[in-house]
Amino acid sequence: MLAYYVERFTTVEINATFYRMPSEKTVAGWGAAAPAGFTYVLKAPQRITHFARLRGVDEPLRYFCDAARTLGDRLGPLLFQLPPNFKKATDRLGEVLALVPDEFRVAFEFRHESWFDDEVYALLRSRNAALCVADTEEGATPAVATADFGYLRLRAVEYSDEDLRRWIETIDRLGAGWRDAFV
């Protein structure tokens, strides 16, 4: 499956890392399987985002970052997708942002509406962390730029041409200061 992706796309979001903490050997293998210029986005393990809910995650986060680091220039952002019932906890978000080494770009997908406020946006901006703009069955999250790159997850089954035009307009509007956009 990976061979199929690297032939057709320039970026892939790895969801397997959400279900199982990857080893350095596994991640290095992914890097070796991709051509120059290919980018991987790794989704943070549920152990960090769902089970621990960003609390006391020093050790698993360090392990995850060490594994991710083996991708070198093929590494894109690390995506932290929080559970829908996880309400705003800026203290925990701040701790995780401080723990992730500055060499990593990070994006956060918040799925509880309490996260969508200026305090959270300011905290993300302070670390150049992207607010993931997600389009789901429940609706779209606020389109707010908080980093010098964008991260959008379009997860509907189908998009009409008009839907895609609206997303292109959103990306154009938000992306004036972006170096990259991951869609």
Predicted segments — roles?
Residues M1-F182:
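Residues lining hydrophobic/aromatic ligand-binding pockets adjacent to catalytic sites
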